[in-house]
């Protein structure tokens, strides 16, 4: 369970719902995920009220407008960013996003929790890394640049560059 302070006194942000086995490109699966996560929210509030001191009267103020899907499709670009590029803190000649630093946040595909292989502990970056422009140029489409989570990268690399600060960095670089 992740609890983050909110701007208003007495409020916190909770990040805890999880659903697996969905296809993020399927409307039916996304609907099922919405239902599962909303049911989880009710149970989470009940748990907080019963077991966490200070949360006896807690309630949901708001929630995301739709379920967040961690990963779906990736384009094939001129270069595929790998976890080894990140671990080695590679600085590419054609970088468009640099000074990126985040942990590997691989969630299990089999159930709640982090990756059962412990990738988040095995892969430690030597420092800040860059993302090459080539990751943003699709192999088979003209007139399109990729930005954010859909750039070309391995599953493990994606667990690192998918976070908002790095996606914003990529977007700024591609759009400039």
Regions found by a protein language model. Name each.
Residues 1-176:
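Flavin (FAD/FMN)-binding glycine-rich loop and adjacent Rossmann-like elements that form
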């Amino acid at each position: 369970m992740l609890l983050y302070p909110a701007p208003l006194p007495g409020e916190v942000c909770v990040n805890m719902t999880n659903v697996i086995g969905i296809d993020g490109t399927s409307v039916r699966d996304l609907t099922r995920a919405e239902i599962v996560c909303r049911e989880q929210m009710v149970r989470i509030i009940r748990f907080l009220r019963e077991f966490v001191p200070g949360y006896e009267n807690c309630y949901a103020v708001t929630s995301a407008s739709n379920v967040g899907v961690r990963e779906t499709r990736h384009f094939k670009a001129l270069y595929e960013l790998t976890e080894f590029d990140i671990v080695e803190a590679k600085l590419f000649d054609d970088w468009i996003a640099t000074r990126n630093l985040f942990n590997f946040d691989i969630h299990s595909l089999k159930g709640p929790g982090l990756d059962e292989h412990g990738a988040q502990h095995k892969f430690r970056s030597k420092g800040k890394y860059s993302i090459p422009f080539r990751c943003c140029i699709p192999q088979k489409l003209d007139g399109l640049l990729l930005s954010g989570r859909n750039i070309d990268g391995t599953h493990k690399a994606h667990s690192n560059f998918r976070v908002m600060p790095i996606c914003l960095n990529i977007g700024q670089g591609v759009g400039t």
